[in-house]
Amino acid sequence: DFLLVNLPHQTIEHMEDLLPLMKRETPSLIRGWAIIDRDDLPGVNDKLTNLLLHHGAANLRLICQEIKGFSATKIFIRIESSQTFI
């Protein structure tokens, strides 16, 4: 399974609704982009890790990485996770 989430202002909010659609027992990749407050990057990583694990992600590899500045206080990030949902 491969899921692209291109809703930069709402990616994180919609992620929980999208995870139940992922196929089980097979490797999957989720990639998305988000605009967040600069200081929230560690919290976003923790929130997504917990969300993915709660939905049964095993062998989880998550990257939340700043791509560029969006404004004085916000950044544009790339989110990528690979996992197998069980």
Region spans (language model):
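SAM-dependent transferase fold signal centered on methyltransferase-like domains
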Residues: D1-I86
